[in-house]
Amino acid sequence: MIYLRKANERGHANHGWLDSWHTFSFANYYDPNFMGFSALRVINDDVIEAGQGFGTHPHKDMEILTYVLEGTVEHQDSMGNKEQVPAGEFQIMSAGTGIRHSEYNPSSTERLHLYQIWIMPEENGITPRYEQRRFDAVQGKQLVLSPDARDGSLKVHQDMELYRWALLKDEQSVHQIAAERRVWIQVVKGNVTINGVKASTSDGLAIWDEQAISIHADSDSEVLLFDLPPV
């Protein structure tokens, strides 16, 4: 089964300094049909104006992933990290027993565009941690997150994998799905056809009870593929 979550059907909140689209229920957007998918709890598509950002705030027992599409994030947290995360890089933070952090757009002229993704951990009370790494190949499937941090990926405390998949126009490829696993695909840019379902920039696809994904790039495209545990 494939369910297409159209970009324009997501929750939307424009605060002036922040324009945010919510794939799943978040803040003032609530839809009981969209509370998450497997271990995914939040996929927010955020544009943050120059010089603006999220002030220091707490988190606990959540894996928080940021993928920067345009601009740079300035990250600061209660572990003593103060980092710049430019476009093309992923940042993972395990909130665990508790962490406080801020995320700002340090530019005075350029907007910041990013995905903020929350993943429920397998267990609560883990030690907080922070990592960032660049994954920006022009073509191919790169492993970004995995439980064992293999092949240069970032570690995530959940039985899941995340791939960043860049495809050139007319490229056709297949991704096998293990029994009972669930897959979420987020289209970062471009136009793709997945098992006959067409999807475009910012669309999402929930996939279950399928043995494989056949993906065709109708234009140069990039998707995030989450291989997730059974519910």
From Swiss-Prot:
Presence of the UniProt keyword Zinc in the record: yes
Keywords: Copper, Dioxygenase, Iron, Metal-binding, Oxidoreductase, Zinc
Binding site for a divalent metal cation: 57, 59, 101, 103
Cofactor, how bound (note): Binds 1 divalent metal cation, Zn(2+), Co(2+) or Fe(2+).
GO MF annotation, one: quercetin 2,3-dioxygenase activity
Necessary cofactors: Zn(2+); Co(2+); Fe(2+)
Membrane-spanning segments: none
Keyword Zinc annotated: yes
Family stated for the protein in its record: Belongs to the pirin family.
Domain notes: Is composed of two structurally similar domains arranged face to face.
Miscellaneous remark of the record: Quercetin is a flavonoid compound synthesized by a variety of plants, including foods for human consumption.
Name of the featured protein: Quercetin 2,3-dioxygenase
